[in-house]
Amino acid sequence: MSLIKEFKAFASRGNVIDMAVGIIIGAAFGKIVSSFVADIIMPPIGIILGGVNFSDLSIVLQAAQGDAPAVVIAYGKFIQTVIDFTIIAFAIFMGLKAINSLKRKQEEAPKAPPAPTKDQELLSEIRDLLKAQQEK
């Protein structure tokens, strides 16, 4: 089998396509959450904490010298990233929880008993005939 045919077989499997769609949607969702945190959540928190802009919070390790930028630890951006992660993790948790509850409901649905096999039907007929002979 040629390399191209193998790749087509691999790429056309449902799991690979589902994974690709999930990655694209996940990336878009991450951007939405980042904007939500940076533009909606953090400004009111900054006002409550005395007009702090979290994205500007940093510790300067070395001041800028000439063309070289300052060396800083940008812990404000880190705080925003942690909040982003927390919201995304919670959303994923809630989605998985919903999916798992749907799976449980499907599993809990009572299954119809399997139809008896021909051997079982034949044995039942023999049993019924033997009972009928004993009653005579």
UniProtKB/Swiss-Prot annotation:
Keywords: Cell inner membrane, Cell membrane, Ion channel, Ion transport, Membrane, Transmembrane, Transmembrane helix, Transport
Gene Ontology cellular component list: plasma membrane
Highest rank taxon of the organism: Bacteria
Transmembrane segments: 9-29, 79-99
The keyword Ribosomal protein appears for this protein: no
Subcellular localization: Cell inner membrane
GO molecular function (one): mechanosensitive monoatomic ion channel activity
Coiled coil: none
Membrane topology, from the record: Multi-pass membrane protein
Signal peptide stretch: none
Tagged with keyword Transmembrane helix: yes
Subunit structure: Homopentamer.
Protein name listed in UniProt: Large-conductance mechanosensitive channel
